[in-house]
Amino acid sequence: MRRTTLIAIAAAVSATLAVSGCDSSDGDGKAPRKQAAPKADGQSINAHPVSDLKQGGSLRFGIDQWITQYNINQVDGQQGDAQDIITAVLPDLFDSDAKGAIHANPNFLVSAKVTSTSPQVVEYQLNPKAKWSDGKPLSWKDFQAQWKALNGSDEAFEAVDTSGYEQISKVEQGSGAHGVKITFSSPYADWQRLFDPLYPASYIDTPEKFNKGWSQKALVTASSFKVGRYDRTAQTITLVPDPKWWGDKPKLDSVVYRVIDSAAETEAYLNKEIDQAPALLPEDYKRLVKAPDTDIRRGARWDEVHITLNGGRGPLKDVEVRHAVSAAINRDGVNESFSKDLSFELKPLNNHFFMPNQEGYQDNSSEFDKYDPEKAKKLLDAAGWKDQGEGKPRTKGGKQLTLDYTLSAGSTSSATDQAELVQQMLGAVGIKVSIKQVPANDYFNKFVNTGNFDIVSFRNVDAVYQTMLTPVFISPKGKNLFQNFGSVGSPKIDELLTKAAGTTDHAEAVKLYNEADVEIWKLGHSIELYQRPQINAVRKGLANFGASGLGDTDYAKVGWLK
């Protein structure tokens, strides 16, 4: 089972800072030593054979908000915690190891391979033991229904991402009762990311079922765990072992997700209410590293923190105003203001598709994210926003240049500090920023996902395949923003992303993604800040869990040491 394997949208409110490398001063008052970034395959999970684990016990997590959509392929299902939960109870056909290499999951697949390249044909043999919790076997019909819902041919299905699925021409029964045969109309290199997780056909085969059927709970499951209880009053979601599971029996009795404000997670961990907490902020790290019975586990994850600019409304519809905002924000200053007390130096991230520890990374930011407040002023002058003097917002047509920075009420102090820094920097060039706090449970559903903001900051995580980022940068279609919440895109970017997804030549794909990245910077889509490594405080006796880096977590193998 995975913990966030699709691209997840995780609010920067959950922690805007990253700590990595070796231990800091551990609270001794000395300045921490700056360390190099972790290796691409870096992970720390306290690995043990299952025989070392005792039977029983619970694993408890904090989540940011109550889940209101469990169909993560639907536009409202993009909250990271929802993806964590649903990928733990639905079939994940492929798993990623510590180096990011993809392997078929034998619990669901006997085999999966490309059997023809012209046209591209992929054939799966499903595990005959694999069944949904309603007793029906997994079959080619599940694949067909998911393809029809996600291929973009019927816009009534509010799909968050059609890439890959729209390149499939046919889904049919393959060899034998458990075979699936998928034919592509054009090559698609990342075919393993499709149908992962897999949803049951009879619960997503109409727009009504697809869009609304999963809005309150996971209707059907097929994994080592199932949802045992949704407790809206206690704000908890409890997973329990599924007795019908055909694979290795889980060691844990339950996995409990509890809604906790991000700022309260450290206290909840110290009070032994949860078993993991992010040790990302200096004030949290100093407390957690000294907590009894605690390991600090570190990993190198695909995890970026950025600021999204909404080009779909207001002053930011003008690309020159977006460039002015970028030029007015000192990324080094924002990052350094947080990293000064950390053991890891937060260097500016200059690529939207690749992390610095990945093959393919190059700096494509050009002049578009260089700190230059004088340039910002000139851009605003040229855009018709007149300077009204120091400390006053610029005006145009009698209107003040004012932007909202939307922030969750559950934000950490660092997220609030970041918003205030941006407010000060933009104020210095004549842009008034109002920090707008909204209820944590509404942050994504009513604001981010709907484009109801001017400026927000959150994270994109676990983009093991670059095609997973397609919905972040493709042009919206009508009211469907996909994951391009700021509505900034172009036909040229769409074309480059389509070409990149369609080539099976890895070097060519890397080249095309970097070409698309150049165009994304030119449009002022977003302001990249930094890559965020994993730093987690975890109970010392917990095995096969912690900071998994690029790898996936198999919850059937997670448990407490004897």
Short names for language-model regions:
Residues P241-R287, K432-S434:
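Ligand-site clamp/hinge motif
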Residues D52, A428, K432-Y443, N449, ...:
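Extracytoplasmic/peripheral linker and loop segments enriched in polar/acidic and small residues
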Residues I329, K347-G389, A409-A415:
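Structural transition elements
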